[in-house]
Amino acid sequence: MTDYSKTVNLLESPFPMRGNLAKREPAWLKSWYEQKRYQKLREIAKGRPKFILHDGPPYANGDIHIGHAVNKILKDIIIRSKTQAGFDAPYVPGWDCHGLPIEVMVEKLHGKDMPKARFRELCREYAAEQIARQKKDFIRLGVLGDWDNPYLTMDFKTEADTVRMLGEIYKSGYLYRGAKPVQFCLDCGSSLAEAEVEYKDKVSPAIDVGYPFKDTAALATAFGLAGIEGKAFAVIWTTTPWTLPASQAVSAGADVVYQLIDTPTGKLVLAKDLAEDALKRYGFSDGIAILAETTGDKLENLHMNHPFLERDIPMLNGEHVTTDAGTGLVHTAPAHGLEDYAVCNKYGIELYNPVNAEGKYIGETPRVAGMRVWEANSVILQWLEETGNLLASSKIEHSYAHCWRHKTPLIYRATGQWFVGMDKAGADGKTLRDKAIKAVDDTEFFPSWGRARLEAMIEGRPDWVVSRQRYWGTPMTFFVHKETGELHPNSAELLEKVAQRIEEKGIEAWFSLDKGELLSAEDCEHYDKLSDTMDVWFDSGSTHYSVLKQREELDWPADLYLEGSDQHRGWFQSSMLTGCASSMGRAPYKQLLTHGFVVDQNGRKMSKSIGNVVAPQEVYNEFGADILRLWAASTDYSGELAISKEILKRVTESYRRIRNTLSFLFANLSDFNPIEDAVQQADMVEIDRYALVLARRLQERVAGDFYPRYAFHFAVKEMVSFCSEDLGAFYLDILKDRLYTTKADSRARRSAQTALYHITRSLVLLIAPILCFTGEEAWDIIGGGAEDSVLFHTWHEFPTINEKAEAELVKKWTAIREAREAVTAAIEPLRADKTVGSSLQAEAEITAPEEMAGYLNALGEELRFALLVSKAEVKVGSELAVAAKASDGEKCERCWHYTRDVGAVAGHETVCKRCAENVGGEGETRHYA
């Protein structure tokens, strides 16, 4: 008796269904590194059009977190997909190495008591250690790049080029020195950039303070009155009592309507829109009378006394005054507020700053001298009560600026700093703000709402404070006049000479420089070296110059910058400003892509205290890096990205669907040689040609649309759907019979294998940018072997088909698929009540509209294969309907179809006539399915 199980083409897959990624990925990485895959790719891609994604440098401190992983994975998907699209897409990773966090860590580890040169040396060593740790994790994620030659902002050449960028901005005319209020962290002991500020709720005292008018006759005139009896006060409201010792004016809104109100305390000047609420705060309900009204422009240049100091206080008109809250009059301390500074500057009032860098009042400040500003609030309230000028006091919770490192409240404090001016006309007569806004217009944004966000930030941002009073940073290599504070007239030439020295010896070349080496004896008497360092955002914001313009394999401007959405305030902006303020005169990127932050499954931020932190190291050690990559790609990164063990398990199911599909495809290609066995498209079975159209259209959507516009979640959805719906639930389901039961080298089977070969190559190429490990594992089988890489190849080329023929083919098989779904639905009740097990136990009678019936009947005897039933009949009717019943045929031992011809061929008593022919004869012929 024949063992028919040995006559079917059931082949083992060289691609296991279990990926075992966590264990196998490290070995693949080692192999790729030994083969110098990245270097080979650069050779292969030479001469192609370039695509430059410039890496925003992560800070060299601490292990990478899940946000870092998302960022690097998204970048890697883009680099890989652009490479496969035919671009030369080098990736040079970088690190941000200077700055306060490293100083803090080095102080913790080694203390503060050491020479500054030794301190900087330890900072450099610490940064290098952190980079090595982070690099290992980034490589483990499968991120492809020039890891042996990354850029570091502490590299001597990069430090030198950062100095040169400073020179570019100096020559452009945007750099200036000024004593201006800046966000100041008392814990850092330094000014902060916009990007280093975060906002949190804070409880502050909220007080109403009366400033006594000096000349009530002048006040009466302003209100159109003949005179005023008794005391009169301009009432301000503030949440920062500690700034009152620096109060130098009161500001009124020129167009705001003010009332003069008689109260038991005296005459009060309040904004009309806020007077009612203010009087309630003061406890006045009886004995009040509105005496007159006027506008703020009439109050200009009236004078008051300071509420507790002997100081004349003028009334100014300020555009920043609103009637949103308070009293409509604003106490104005130019040392502690940008708007205050601006209005006092307009009136020629010289800035007075009573607070030093430690946040303490200087010695000449009565009562609070030597006291830190936060401690002074209660003393100042007591002082106001004593003078009788405190009208109300309460507490208020409001959003307040905090240091992003120390999480402590900031103060505005006027210090001598170097600024890049936003509204200062440069050497070309244009302001940096105008240039930057134009640069926003010239940039493409993903997602599109990034444009409005960045534009609003550029429009509202203050001048950029680029100087810092720190030790571990790129120095501002200027010589400054001892008396005037002016820069040396030959600053541009001197700066280049210093840059050349830094290029050889690093920043220590400046710190150890004797000024006599570069200046004449006379100049040495009048000029000193500037001791300030640069804002680290200037370092990273200059990398388009220090990296893109300096490395041969790169290009300027970059095609794309990709970072988290917080970088609208950070790197995107600092890069844009250095680009626009330099001789380049534009943003250093053509496109900006932003991704959201990672949260847990409940939308909460990652927090050690909550215990919801998901570390990338844990994910790749348990699931494999490809699962983490698939999660990042399948999540819509334009919003928050949710992650948890449960979410990762769901992602694993999607991965399994793709992997199982590939395993099936490879099993059925294991005896196929595309050179010897491929069937010409014209000779292929019709459904195979249809499957090729589906696969090509998938490639057109994924490679031609989703990858180019960075819509990776759509790409994943389409590829998983293709594997489960087009292949798993339709084409491969139908194909199994032909693959397993027809002769091994028959046209029917080789046609199917030809289609599978094209589908597999295309699918492997499509998944490879996302599933880089799985893609390479699969390419080892279908590509050129272990030394080959999927990245050495561009998107698959499908056999061409006439447009009209394709349209007709798709129309026909779309109708057949609709009929098949109806047949499957009709059989379901029979399966539910155990009348049949598999659909092959059923027969179907289909009623269909004329066109669909024509398509179905055109398949003839092969219709049953397309519908996965043992028998199918079709008749014409007005609408689609199916009647299904159990077959009365006998089951074929070999193909499992139920037919009435089992045993019809002598010697093959347990199989159908078709199987007997496939085993002992020339084999069946297929045309359609």
From Swiss-Prot:
Residues noted as binding L-isoleucyl-5'-AMP in the record, renumbered to the chain: 563
Any GO BP: isoleucyl-tRNA aminoacylation
Note on cofactor: Binds 1 zinc ion per subunit.
Gene Ontology CC: cytosol
Sorted UniProt keywords: Aminoacyl-tRNA synthetase, ATP-binding, Cytoplasm, Ligase, Metal-binding, Nucleotide-binding, Protein biosynthesis, Zinc
Entry-linked InterPro entries: aa-tRNA-synth_I_CS (IPR001412), aa-tRNA-synth_Ia (IPR002300), Anticodon_Ile_BEm (IPR033708), Ile-tRNA-ligase (IPR002301), Ile-tRNA-ligase_type1 (IPR023585), Ile-tRNA_ligase (IPR050081), M/V/L/I-tRNA-synth_anticd-bd (IPR013155), Rossmann-like_a/b/a_fold (IPR014729)
Sequence motif 'HIGH' region, location on chain: 58-68
UniProt EC number: 6.1.1.5
Residues given in the record as ATP binding sites: 608
Domain of life: Bacteria
Motif ('KMSKS' region): 605-609
Leader peptide range in chain numbering: none
GO molecular function: aminoacyl-tRNA deacylase activity; ATP binding; isoleucine-tRNA ligase activity; tRNA binding; zinc ion binding
Enzyme class: ligase
Cofactor or coenzyme needed: Zn(2+)
Family: Belongs to the class-I aminoacyl-tRNA synthetase family. IleS type 1 subfamily.
PANTHER family documented for this protein: ISOLEUCINE--TRNA LIGASE, MITOCHONDRIAL (PTHR42765:SF1), SOLEUCYL-TRNA SYNTHETASE (PTHR42765)
Quaternary state and interactors: Monomer.
Name of the protein in its database record: Isoleucine--tRNA ligase
Source organism per UniProt: Neisseria meningitidis serogroup A / serotype 4A (strain DSM 15465 / Z2491)
